[in-house]
Regions:
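Gly/serine-rich nucleotide phosphate-binding loop at the start of the catalytic core
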Residues: 3-71
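Short, charged/polar micro-motifs that form catalytic or ligand-binding hotspots
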Residues: 24, 39-43, 55, 121-122, ...
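Short, contiguous clusters of charged residues that form electrostatic/catalytic patches at enzyme active sites
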Residues: 36, 130-133, 168-175
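Short, glycine/acidic-rich beta->alpha junctions
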Residues: 45, 79, 127, 191-195, ...
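Active-site-proximal, Lys/Arg-enriched surface segment
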Residues: 69-143, 148, 152-154
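An internal, acidic/charged active-site-proximal segment
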Residues: 155-222
Length: 222
């Protein structure tokens, strides 16, 4: 019986990190593409498109990366669970500052789900694009990603979707992190998330505003 080939090496720290997820991929090729995506996302290219990532990762076939993202048999949920589990272990119970922010990517056309003409915060203007609400942790001057949720405009809802405001998505992110057992004492967010009426969902998980409605002290303990 022939021995399975080893995955093509990339950057040492990328290889070491991705090895923690290797068992989640059914074959070596899928695992390699997982590593190549990390190399591309960490590179200095301005637009992290699949063709650009394929080029910077070693002149790969962009279609192969597209197949990995769209059709390869791996689970986003399993990957997210593994990542959050590893992060929780690394934190070892330490509290951090939780930052809620939104970001957007400009898109041409409306082929991609939930793309609409809407306000893109990081561009500071209305544009055609997709927006997400993101949760980051800050500890010892290190910023690390936690979770995100795509904002779904009313005009682009799919069958079975329920419209949720950005503050409502923020509440869901906080509650999910609490469910995971992450510990955080302060939530930083844009004033939008503390001043709008639809942010009443913060009530069960916040105690009092600290400043201008953009800082809130919460219980991040399970």
């Amino acid at each position: 019986m022939s021995k399975a080939r080893q995955a093509i090496p990339t950057v040492t720290f990328v290889d070491e990190y991705c090895r923690l997820y290797q068992d989640l991929f059914p074959d070596v090729r899928s695992f390699e593409h997982f590593k190549f995506l990390h190399v591309g996302m960490l590179s200095e290219i301005k637009r992290k498109t699949l063709p650009a990532i394929a080029k910077v990762a070693g002149d790969l076939d962009p279609q192969a990366l597209h197949h990995f993202v769209v059709k390869a048999p791996w689970s986003v949920e399993e990957l997210r669970t593994r990542r959050l589990t590893l992060l929780r272990q690394a934190l070892a119970g330490r509290s951090f500052v939780l930052c809620i922010d939104e970001t957007g990517d400009r898109k041409k056309g409306k082929t991609t789900e939930y793309v609409a003409h809407q306000y893109i915060g990081n561009l500071g203007k209305l544009a055609n694009g997709i927006v997400s609400v993101n949760a980051y942790g800050i500890l010892d001057h290190i910023t690390f990603p936690l979770l995100f949720k795509v904002y779904k405009p009313r005009t682009r809802l799919q069958p079975g979707d329920t419209y949720k405001t950005k503050p409502q998505l923020a509440v869901e992110l906080i509650q999910e992190l609490q469910h995971w057992g992450f510990r955080f004492e302060v939530v930083l967010a844009d004033s939008l998330y503390g001043e709008r009426g639809d942010c009443i969902g913060f009530a069960p998980i916040t105690s009092r505003p600290i400043s201008r409605g953009c800082l809130r002290r919460v219980s991040g303990k399970s």
